Amino acid sequence: MIQKMEPAIAISLHYNALPDDGDAINTQGVAAFWYHSQAQNLAAFLHDYLVKKLDRPSYGVFWNNLALTRPTAAPSILLELGFMINPLEFEWITNPQAQQKLALALADGITEWFGQNREPIANNH
């Protein structure tokens, strides 16, 4: 669908989980995944923006060959916005006010990224 629609960017939003034997208490944070180099800047920027604006822990920014990061028509990233298996993060994930803040921060971050990465328009005069 991303290849067909050719959007300016593609962002897939998720909440993370761990295997049953994972460390639910000590694993937390926002993560971003990218595959093609054209998406690395977007992944790092939005990860850092959300961590800072929402005062959330960082899980990191990673290169990974995920289906939703492979399209080449646009910078395509996958964001993991927290760990559902972590009790404290689950409370944050399911809090309506936190969801609203997250949505606004994501929209603001995308807007700011576009502002910083706009291609100059050629002057044909």
Tell me what each language-model feature is.
Residues 1-125:
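Active-site-proximal helix/loop segments of hydrolytic enzymes
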